[in-house]
A protein has these predicted regions:
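An N-terminal-biased, well-structured beta-alpha scaffold segment characteristic
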Residues: 4-104, 201-203, 223
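Rossmann-like dinucleotide/phosphate-binding beta-alpha-beta segment
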Residues: 13, 33, 144-232
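Short glycine-/small-residue-rich Rossmann-like dinucleotide-binding loops
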Residues: 64, 86, 212-214, 240-241, ...
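Residue-level detector of alpha-helix initiation sites
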Residues: 66, 87-90, 105, 109-110, ...
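Rossmann-like dinucleotide-binding domain for NAD(H)/NADP(H)
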Residues: 233-236, 241-324
């Protein structure tokens, strides 16, 4: 994503870029080779960064802190913000756009990783991989209680058919499944997924995989009413954003059998940085930790060695496309 009106480079032809999160070395190296001036500050507080941000025309971030209105007001010379990741929820995008600051993200950089991880969660759920492995390691040899399900013949529903949703659908091509997608944009369906209304998806899906950003419109979208609108019990996968789901309602649906199992790479209780959970441990989260119907991973769907490099390359290419 970029804004439509990026500002021109500085008079001497060089932009000063502040990197406030560590990333793959190629990002800084290639920008340096292209004539950009690069400074790093991975430890200063937001307040301390605000004191010097006026010196820079560009900033490269992941999710260390929020780029809010107060920060942007101090960034008087900022021309672009590049986030090494897919989402931009840590940035006040509307206010940045009002200041003609270009916004750059890299969903292309980790879409393959997310697609693979989503499929891994689904297959693990269907075949009780985690549960069976833990039992064998503890000396139990339980075959019948770990009898699994096959994907063939199932209908997979994907909500959010952008980079991540399309990647997951592509991974499903080797299975005899029906893939449906729903998106707020029209005409995004392709040879891998048929675009349908939300109502049709809820009527037909055996599996729901979420691939939407976290916005005011999607916040708490997966709640009791949303879940109950599904005609059949279903498996639920979330590799998108945790705050799109009301965890207490998810737990209730698992307990009632409406949701057969959940694979969650993200959860409602993550901090904005995605590096840690919030300090407390609410009861719904305790349930997720103890349920053998739930698989949890720590927001690593897009976190591979390959995507680490690819994300950086996408950001470099997009910055150079605007300013070289």
């Amino acid at each position: 994503m970029t804004s439509n009106n990026p500002q021109p480079i500085t008079d001497n032809g060089q932009l000063k870029i502040l990197h406030i999160d560590s990333n793959h070395p190629l990002l800084k190296e290639q920008l340096q080779e292209s004539g950009f001036i690069n400074h790093e500050d991975f430890t200063s507080s937001k307040a301390d960064v605000e004191k010097k941000i006026h010196e820079y025309q560009g900033i490269v971030i992941r999710s260390r802190f929020k780029i809010d209105k107060a920060f942007l007001d101090k960034a008087t010379n900022l021309k672009f913000i590049a986030r090494v990741g897919a989402g931009l929820e840590s940035i006040d995008c509307e206010y940045a756009a009002s200041k003609n600051i270009a916004l750059i993200a890299a969903p292309e950089g980790n879409r393959n990783a997310v697609g693979e991880h989503t499929l891994a969660l689904l297959l693990s759920l269907f075949n009780n991989i985690n549960k069976a492995s833990n039992e064998v390691k503890s000396g139990q040899w339980n075959r019948e209680s770990n009898r699994g399900h096959e994907l063939d013949g199932k209908t997979i529903g994907i909500i959010g058919y952008g980079n991540m949703g399309k990647s997951f659908a592509k991974k499903l091509r080797g299975f005899e499944v029906t893939v449906l997608c729903h998106d707020i944009l029209e005409n995004v369906g392709d040879q891998n997924a048929k675009q349908v209304s939300l109502e049709e998806l809820q009527q037909k899906a055996d599996v729901l995989s979420l691939h939407i950003p976290w916005t005011p419109e999607t916040n708490n979208m997966v709640n009791q009413d949303f879940i109950n609108a599904f005609q059949k019990p279903f498996w639920f996968i979330n590799t998108a954003r945790g705050k799109n789901v009301v965890t207490a309602d998810l737990v209730s649906a698992i307990e009632s059998g409406k949701i057969l199992g959940a694979g969650l790479d993200v959860n409602e209780y993550e901090k904005l940085s995605f590096e840690t959970l919030t300090g407390d441990m609410p009861e719904p989260y305790r349930y997720l930790l103890n349920s053998n119907k739930v698989i949890l991973t720590p927001h690593i769907a897009g976190w591979t060695f390959e995507s680490h490099q690819c994300l950086a390359q996408v950001i470099v290419d997009k910055i150079k496309a605007l300013y070289c």
